[in-house]
Every structure is written in structure tokens, then in C-alpha cells.
Amino acid sequence: MIKEILKKADEKMGKSIVALKRELASMKAGRANPAMLDRIDAEYYGSMTPLNQLANISVPEARVLLIQPWDKSSMGAIEKAILKSDLGLNPSNDGTVIRLVIPELTEETRKNIVKTVKKTGEETKVAIRSIRRDCNDDVKNLKKDDVSEDDIKKTEDDIQKKTDKYIKEIDSIISAKEKEILSI
């Protein structure tokens, strides 16, 4: 039972880190990255469909995204979805592909993105601590199953070590993203 609790803590904390990385990848840092478009859905035959299911997205240059729709009739919907998104990008359509030029970031924009990155990191830390609390509650419930106090204390310490490890990893991910955004 103790091993299952530790495994559950590890899995959930790991998923939080993966979600953080995915979220940060979608934030623009002055460089083109197909993950920027992950949260954009376009209306396609009456239903909202993720952009990466409607087109091939590539990076031909450092600051250019090239979107090649598999169905040319979806180009208008893709353009409209990009314009409606909070990315602030202007698509240019040449009839076969859509180009997105990522503009240089101003200092003010960079600082705002860094604030958002830090906020996202803090939210992930809160999620990790919440997982720790839930797992510690599960461990405390083991007292009813005749598990020794020493085993319970050791398990709680192990959970805390995992928490500390993941919090440190979050800090390094956030720090790296800040450097990426602030470097000109």
C-alpha cells in the first residue's frame, strides 16, 4: 500500500511537470514554435478541431511558422482562429500555405510574459503541494490498517523529498524559460 501511494505521488507530480512544460512551450518567446498553436481550435465542418489536426505546421525560419492545411477549404477557418487567438499574430495566406511571422518582442512584452511564466510556475507548485497533501492524507489513513508509526513517518518523509525534487525542477524550468524570453 505504501509503495502504491509513493508511485501515485510520483505519477501525479510528473504529470504536473509535463503539463507545465506544455503550457510554457505555447508561450511565445520571440521564436517560432509549433506548440504556440496547440491551444488554437478552428471550426471545421461544424466542429472545433485543433489546428495540428487540420494542417502540417513547420518552422522554415527562426521566426516564421508555416501552416500547410491538408484541406485547402479550411484555410479561412484556420486564419480566423489565429486572428481570434490571444497570440496577436497576423496570418498571411498565399492560397496554398499560411505564414505566421513572429514579431520581435518589446521589453514590456517580455516582462509581461515573464510574469505569466512565474504565475504558471507558482500554480504548478501549488498543484504539487496539493498532491503531497492528498498522499499524506492517504498515508495517515494507513494507521487504521495497522501500519507502524515509523513506516508512516518514513513514507511522509519520502513524499516530502519527492515534493522538494519536483519543486526544484519547476524552479529550473521557470528559470530557463525566463532566460529564453529575456535574451535578445
From Swiss-Prot:
> Does the record bear tRNA processing in its keywords?
no
Q: Which GO terms describe its cellular component?
A: cytoplasm
What Pfam families does UniProt report for this protein, alphabetically?
Answer: RRF (PF01765)
Q: Where in the cell is it found?
A: Cytoplasm
- Asked if the keyword Cytoplasm belongs to this entry, the reply reads yes
Task: Name any Gene Ontology BP term.
Answer: translational termination
**What are the alphabetically sorted keywords of the record?**
Cytoplasm, Protein biosynthesis
Q: What is its main location?
A: cytoplasm
- Where are the bilayer-spanning segments? none
Xref: InterPro entries: Ribosome_recyc_fac, Ribosome_recyc_fac_dom, RRF_sf
Tell me, what is one Gene Ontology molecular-function annotation carried by this entry?
ribosomal large subunit binding
**HAMAP family membership:** RRF (MF_00040)
Q: What is the role of this chain?
A: Responsible for the release of ribosomes from messenger RNA at the termination of protein biosynthesis. May increase the efficiency of translation by recycling ribosomes from one round of translation to another.
Recorded family membership: Belongs to the RRF family.
The name under which this protein is listed is Ribosome-recycling factor
